[in-house]
């Protein structure tokens, strides 16, 4: 079963923001995806501050997320 849930990271622990149907000790794979709105804000800020080419900023962001 695959399901997307929102979690909050606090003090080294990912805490679900909604009920999760898992048994104690069950293991799952987690994919951490950056918030798209936050990524767009960061890129806009860099464009206005650093005078870099958009392609340079996108390249750096891609490598940071890889």
Curated annotation (Swiss-Prot):
Belongs to the UPF0165 family. Keywords: Toxin-antitoxin system. This is Putative antitoxin APE_0279a.1. The keyword DNA repair does not apply. Possibly the antitoxin component of a type II toxin-antitoxin (TA) system. The keyword Lyase does not apply. SUPFAM superfamilies: AF2212/PG0164-like (SSF141694).
